[in-house]
Amino acid sequence: MIDRKDTNRFKLVSKYSPSGDQPQAIETLVDNIEGGEKAQILKGATGTGKTYTMSQVIAQVNKPTLVIAHNKTLAGQLYGEFKEFFPDNAVEYFVSYYDYYQPEAYVPSSDTYIEKDSSVNDEIDKLRHSATSSLLERNDVIVVASVSCIYGLGSPKEYADSVVSLRPGQEISRDQLLNNLVDIQFERNDIDFQRGKFRVRGDVVEVFPASRDEHAFRIEFFGDEIDRIREIESLTGRVLGEVEHLAIFPATHFMTNDEHMEEAISKIQAEMENQVELFEKEGKLIEAQRIRQRTEYDIEMLREMGYTNGVENYSRHMDGRSEGEPPFTLLDFFPEDFLIMIDESHMTMGQIKGMYNGDRSRKEMLVNYGFRLPSALDNRPLRREEFESHVHQIVYVSATPGDYEMEQTDTVVEQIIRPTGLLDPEVEVRPSMGQMDDLLGEINLRTEKGERTFITTLTKRMAEDLTDYLKEMGVKVKYMHSDIKTLERTEIIRDLRLGVFDVLIGINLLREGIDVPEVSLVAILDADKEGFLRNERGLIQTIGRAARNSNGHVIMYADKITDSMQRAMDETARRRRLQMDYNEKHGIVPQTIKKEIRDLIAITKSNDSDKPEKVVDYSSLSKKERQAEIKALQQQMQEAAELLDFELAAQIRDVILELKAID
């Protein structure tokens, strides 16, 4: 077991100081946390600097913090912001590491078994390992996660107990170290040296930790004693410095020792026999044969390799858990006294609630037809009440908190005043009759000023028809539908900001997480059609898209004013009055937010100049030139990966592989 350093403190670095409502919000949140309050809500209007307030709170209470967002894009944005605020602390990123994921499933109607198929993003896997190792080594850690953090991850105790701890002067033979590395799922590869692998050259062992991407460690032996440990550049072997202590964390999160493995295997065998007997009694001979064949193969792999594909389905036995007991998750890697912050909580808490049921219905089918043992049902996400049991202290962050959050606490801390002095937009209702011509006129007014427009519709058909109509009228417009991938979506936002087009139309894509200061008009069609997209919270979120421009204006097209519309307009007007009073008192003139476009697209740079320049004929380069080219590209790849631009990083990697192949 390793000792966690608990003396580190968070150090917030920012050229800004709290302003507007921020000082009061920060003070209240910190006082409540230090006073032991379990739950509170930060109700912050769009553009009031909620992330900065969160950072100030984290720095002042000085607790390890888990920040949960409801999708990878928002998690990536938050990760980048927290990295800037806390450059000297451990800011980690923990999301699903699948680029592509087809879960294992069975469709009885067509007798179709769909095998699990996935593509793992190596960079995100590295970041996940970095998160868990940081949590066990230090206390000044912020982990920004998606709801993947409530999925099973393996026992933190087994993970920590499996750490290989090395120091200069330690008595351990080279071969014993190699055995220890294999036990924690490292692979020996003397040629292709990358994460999770080690290589051996005489009395020198080089290890590439699973949580690193360009630095490895060289362990030099003198007999059966470690002579010294050095940190090196994995590519060039250049020595970066001496190391007094090296903790090598397992290459997988699903760890168990030999004794526990044998216990687990005996339990798996017993469960298999019970399931076979049950199937045979029910006359399900095919299912009985199937579960025996599949399980015996997995047991053989576990005995020989300590691992098998789908090992997570046996995690209940390997962790020593009882039936129905919740799995270990990222939350178990945190110390007991940690802080949780839920970003856009009105969305995120709904996701946390829904994960369990969807997972269980799919797995029950696999169990009923002999593809998995019943214990596979315990490889699952947490139920919401199980998530709640992990909560020591929590802050829900949203402009529109949901009913669930409001039931958890009466402590609501408002943040309405923007540091920029910007007001919530004016909102007006216009009749739907003649809305197309009216909207066209409003768009043209904005376009003449170099401003942009968001339009939100209720149906795909309406969005497509409106897009076609505006194009015919000479408007530069795009429709962003739900099939568009995250990377493309961010590029569309970038093009809107650059003025490649002036109008963006969407359905449920113009609410949380899209902040474009150039947008001065938001048009809401069918505003009086009550429902998920036109309830009070949905309308307030959509109105907020115009709150980053000093000319922000919202038009609701409707034939009547619904209760949701009225409440959304009343709340917006209330905030606007408070903001105007504050500005008048302090002599503030609202200014449109000046936001560099590269900040919005940091995780997806799409400029052609950012692509690696591919040399047409690498064979014409000398070996020394090729090595220099590889080193330069490695640096570019590293920078792209740190910005979470995995598409660009993969392109650079392909160029590097092509260069290496020449040798």
From Swiss-Prot:
Keywords: ATP-binding, Cytoplasm, DNA damage, DNA excision, DNA repair, Excision nuclease, Nucleotide-binding, SOS response. Signal peptide: none annotated. Residues 627-662 form the UVR domain. InterPro entries: Helicase/UvrB_N, Helicase_ATP-bd, Helicase_C-like, P-loop_NTPase, UVR_dom, UVR_dom_sf, UvrB, UvrB_inter. It is found in: Cytoplasm. It holds the Pfam family UvrB. Gene3D superfamilies: P-loop containing nucleotide triphosphate hydrolases, UVR domain. ATP binds at residues 44-51. GO terms for biological process: nucleotide-excision repair; SOS response. Residues 435-601 form the Helicase C-terminal domain. A motif (Beta-hairpin) lies at residues 97-120. One of its GO terms (cellular component) is cytoplasm. Residues 31-418 form the Helicase ATP-binding domain. It comes from the Bacteria. One of its GO terms (molecular function) is excinuclease ABC activity. The beta-hairpin motif is involved in DNA binding. Belongs to the UvrB family. Forms a heterotetramer with UvrA during the search for lesions. Interacts with UvrC in an incision complex. The UvrABC repair system catalyzes the recognition and processing of DNA lesions. A damage recognition complex composed of 2 UvrA and 2 UvrB subunits scans DNA for abnormalities. Upon binding of the UvrA(2)B(2) complex to a putative damaged site, the DNA wraps around one UvrB monomer. DNA wrap is dependent on ATP binding by UvrB and probably causes local melting of the DNA helix, facilitating insertion of UvrB beta-hairpin between the DNA strands. Then UvrB probes one DNA strand for the presence of a lesion. This is UvrABC system protein B. It comes from Streptococcus agalactiae serotype V (strain ATCC BAA-611 / 2603 V/R). The lineage of its organism: Bacteria, Bacillati, Bacillota, Bacilli, Lactobacillales.
